[in-house]
Amino acid sequence: MKRDFTFFCRIWIGIPFFSGLVNGFSMSPPTLDNTKDQLVINANDTLNITCRGQRILDWSWPEESLSKVEFTDRQGQQSPTDTPGYREIRLKECQGVAGKPYCKILILTNAQANDSGYYRCFYKDIKAVIDGTTAASIFVFVRDPEHPFIKRGDNDMETIFITDSETHIEVPCLVSDPDLKVTLFSLVPYPEPVDGSVVTWNNKKGWSIPRHIIQNTSTFIGFYCSISVQNSQHTSSIYVVQVIGLKFYEFKLFPEDSPVELMQGESLVLNCTALVDFNTGVDFQWDYPGKKENRLASLQPLRNVLDEATEISSILSIRNIHLDDSGYYTCWANTLEMKRELTTVVIVHEKPFISLDYRNGSVIEAKEGQKSVRLSVKVSAYPSPEIQWYKNGKLISSKNSSRFKVQQHSLQIRDVCKQDAGEYMLVLKNSPAALEKRLNFTLIVNVPPQIHEKEAAPPTNLYGKGTRQILTCTADGSPPASISWQWRPWSPCDLERTRRALRRRGGRDQSPFCHNWMDLDPEHAVNPIESIDTLTQMVDGKEKTVGRVVIQNASVPAMYKCLAENRVGKDERLIYFYVTTIPEGFDIEMEPSEDPLEQDLVQLKCNADNFTYENLRWYRLDPQTVPPELDCKSLHQYATFLEGQLSFQTTSNNWVLQLNITNIQLQDEGNYVCEVQNRRTGVKHCHRKYIPVKAMEAPRYRHNPTNHTVNVSESLQMNCDVEGTPFPQLSWFKDNQPLHQISGILLQDSNRTLSIQRVREEDAGLYTCSACNQKGCVQSSATVSVIGSDDKTNVEIVILIGTGVIAIFFWVLLLVIFCNVKRVNPADIKTGYLSIIMDPGEVPLEEQCEYLPYDSSQWEISRDRLRLGKVLGHGAFGKVIEASIFGHDKKSSANTVAVKMLKEGATASEHKALMSELKILIHIGNHLNVVNLLGACTKPNGPLMVIVEYCKYGNLSNFLRAKREFFLPYRDRSPKTQSQVRRMIEAGQASQSEHQPSTSSTNPPRVTVDDLWKTPLTIEDLICYSFQVARGMEFLASRKCIHRDLAARNILLSENNVVKICDFGLARDIYKDPDYVRKGNARLPLKWMAPESIFDKVYTSQSDVWSFGVLLWEIFSLGASPYPGIQIDEDFCKRLKDGTRMRAPDNASPEIYGIMLACWQGEPRERPTFPALVEILGDLLQENSLPEIPFNVSQSSEDDGFSQASSRPPSQEEIRLACNTLPTRYYNCVPFAGCVMVGPSSTCHSRVKTFEELPMEMTSHKTQHDSQTDSGMVLASDELERFEHKHRGAMLTTATTGQSTDRLISCPSVSSSGSGGGLLRPVFFTQLSGQTFYNNEYGHLSEEGVSDYFSSSDQAV
């Protein structure tokens, strides 16, 4: 999806090639001098293995007790120590070869039996060790007749733990000789040999035993192995099998809302519930304020055995609660393997009360078109009072207007309009206690004009030639705006005049300067105009002016502009109308079927737009030699050229290269690639098509027809159950004579079923079914015997006629009743949706989705227009598939999209969840910088499909890591590029309109640009990515959505350097619960979470701002993992809360690092908003697009961080961020962004501690069988919850104190005029070393599918 006011960061000539073929450069794995999978040596021999590769190498070996000694050729080989029993592994550097410059030799002298095992050579600087990709291994057997078994310890008995779900048991009887014959014995309780036909032996792993062997006996004890070597019997350790239950599915403390508030004298009931696996014992312990004083409390245990787990509870009850009972109530659940705890706060009030005060003053100002305005108050009350809002003396109800939202104790008005101005009053009542409080507000509304399509529609679109198109501009203003239309021929705009206009207008123009505009006249239009209309419509409850131009026949590219103007101001929208016959310019069609059969004729057509491409060629990839990742440039090394028939379609101006495969065979199955060349750039692009071939199979009977004996006048049905490929043609014979369908004899289901409605005597005989296809024929016969006579009594006929008349009468009666039943009016349903979704406090958001309307005329796409491709990713209950979408005639070119659908066997609830996600995406609307909804397939004749945008370059994190070697801080900037960047910034900053959902479900076409893989990455690109993410988050925040997982892995990169935010379906409506508390344990990305989210489970738009700061760190570290080398434990969380922050990445300027620190403010209200971040990053992006400033130019001492070119006074947000734009780079003492505004000047905390300043202690936390920590990235569940409760306890018992830091630098005062030294380009330091971090950013805190935490999988896209 594109936006009409956006010029992309980098426009290069060319079209990106198919992403399924290119994923970056490939890397070959290391190679060993011994290419076999195993090596056998004798005891006391010397093991010598040489490894070569493309990167720095290292070795691993099975015997961990052996020490490692490394030396090079220059150091010489030192002799091993003479200490008896001392052995070591020696690693020696050696000379590399061409293509593999690194070499390392492993030397082990005096090898022993216990040295048997895998010896693995791997790339040292890559964390993922995978054989065949980043590593190479060989299994070495050290043959020792005296020690045939390998023992790693001194234990003669080992325990094998298994769970109920495991089907096999692995008994690790490892041997030192691969040719030994090992016998497996089971102790039941006496030794018995195990039947060798049911077990499997692997000389590298041991025995694999089916689970049922130990389930069939009650006296089973364990296993052991035996070997006879040189007339000597040897036995292994005894392996005892233990079945245990370890899973801790869920742990909750009810009520879940914290704090729990009560009135003195009421009863307190807390329920601590654990959902665990069978055979798991749980011991509950409670701690509460009155426990030490022996406060009378009752504990009631409960145990409930469910179908798949056991629910165990402990209920704490305290009657007649006192004020002294206020405090922390903690429940511990202990098992043999783990310990869980939950804490809630109980507050006991003495009497009812209401305390009320203003939060932001009594006078509130807003602008027309502003996304929302909030009337907020500070309220402290118990019990919860009744809330009433009045406007001009009239009660406000969310049922009367969907734009008014009462959330807790605040009133939010969305889509502010001039009618919202007036006097507002809040009334809080507690009728039983006779308490009432009131506050009055005054709302002032200012009105600017807006064109809404600028936020929802792309500026450039591809229009099919010969199609009817409608250009629309919707404007609102006060007074109503008038709309006029202009056009100009398709040609570049005047760049020089654009630059002068930008400077003259202060860098705030909304569109490029283009001259030669002419009024649009239907009589003299280059594209025939059907009509030009201007009308007034009610849109979202507001009166708006809509201008439409209906183009009867799109034939010539042109540029159109609509202008909306009133006496307050004006706005304009520029539309690039590009006409083409193939929207993508390049696609592949396969006829006549996507699933051909053996011996079919298959036609592959490669269609390419003649305006863009030439030199079409067909290739077939060799499946034996093609690498996993293939560049189009290296295609010829792994493919065979195929001759095709080239033709030119004059009417559509397209080239068609047709490849005919006659009489296709099984060996013809595979990947076929069409290669084309861009006419302007010469770059070659490829599309790949996989042809599956189904083998033909001869007909065969699954069940032969059976003999039948029936009475006269009864019905008879015979089935011919056959199968084959292709499906056979079926024929029936009676007494060797062909049988055809006549009255009373029916042949149904492609002749599979023969039905005789009323059997007669002459129907007896031999019936034969014959099935034939290209592979042959089969036939089978059955005898039908008829009993009785054809004579029928009149009584039977009368009964049949009477029964038919009665049945007809009842059917007519039911039809009349059904037609008179009152049906629900769809308009009533829509009204209900509008009232419910605006008050989710009464109905959960998930239930609201049932009322959300789905307009099939707008969003429904026929499944025939989709062609599914490869799977891009899997989710909890669904999958994402790459697909192509065609036009209505299925002959036009296809666009690439991503399709989200359910897996096979999905339940009704999963189907409902995907349908709810579809409706939520429709409700959120479209934006350039989010992954947008394109359409859906919901009709019942196929699977449910949700169609979204496809982003070919994958997620931003992987892209940045792959581009590290091609990172250049700066590059030459052409005037055209600088102008485009300026226009993009100004279009984003000047736009203040509400983001409206698009009414079009068509896929956005691709614009011709160079491949991003082939262009260098610059600082300007990094700032551009940051700017776009801020704009996308600004849009989501305007739709009242909180992301909660904003990270580079959830940012996708599309063509033209456009980034799109994904996984925002995980967000929740902010009005459902402002202090959103996640239920149960979940996967927590702690490195990206704000302190209030970690400690208090509070998620707001300001917590997303914190995550945005971490995302900035990722971008300017080129995809590095945040907090590198820091263990994520309790100490980390404590220091994060105390103000310790990450230091600046090497590629970040002081301005960028200042923005990071501002986003990491401990107090959420002090963090910048996303609109402010869009403004600031837009200015930085514009400055970085200017010509280079030499590195030796330094800032003056009077530089306050603001550009002199700006004629406006600095905003409060910019003044606060200016404190961080110091030219000096600090490492352990960095500038701190926490500025405090005092009159016209500002003061700052002068110093902030970073994680490098105070080394983190690398402590080890024992979490047996927890499976919740992953490479130190998150806390284990028990440690996290224990630390949260400790944090809450500290908050109640001690007053919060600010962190003391030494003042090193004073922040310069900022005058109200905002003048100061101009910003100079900062000196950036060396780029990152190229190390790739593969740490998993999550840790499992619950079993998948058990927690009620809503999750979405979406595109791998």
Swiss-Prot record:
InterPro entries: Ig-like_dom, Ig-like_dom_sf, Ig-like_fold, Ig_I-set, Ig_sub, Ig_sub2, Immunoglobulin_dom, Kinase-like_dom_sf. The modification Phosphotyrosine is found at residues 1071, 1076, 1226-1227, 1334, 1338. Glycans are attached at residues 44, 48, 114, 216, 271, 360, 400, 440, 553, 610, 660, 707, 711, 751. Residues 25-121, 138-244, 255-343, 352-442, 453-583, 583-690, 699-785 form the Ig-like C2-type domain. The keyword tRNA-binding does not apply. Present in an inactive conformation in the absence of bound ligand. Binding of vegfc or vegfd leads to dimerization and activation by autophosphorylation on tyrosine residues. Its EC number is 2.7.10.1. SUPFAM superfamilies: Immunoglobulin, Protein kinase-like (PK-like). One of its GO terms (cellular component) is receptor complex. ATP binds at residues 872-880, 900. Residues 1-24 form the signal peptide. Autophosphorylated on tyrosine residues upon ligand binding. Autophosphorylation occurs in trans, i.e. one subunit of the dimeric receptor phosphorylates tyrosine residues on the other subunit. CDD domains: Ig (cd00096), IgI_VEGFR (cd05862). Its main location: membrane. It is a single-pass type I membrane protein. Residues 978-1007, 1192-1212 are annotated as: Disordered. Interacts with vegfc and vegfd. Monomer in the absence of bound vegfc or vegfd. Homodimer in the presence of bound vegfc or vegfd. This is Vascular endothelial growth factor receptor 3. The gene is flt4.
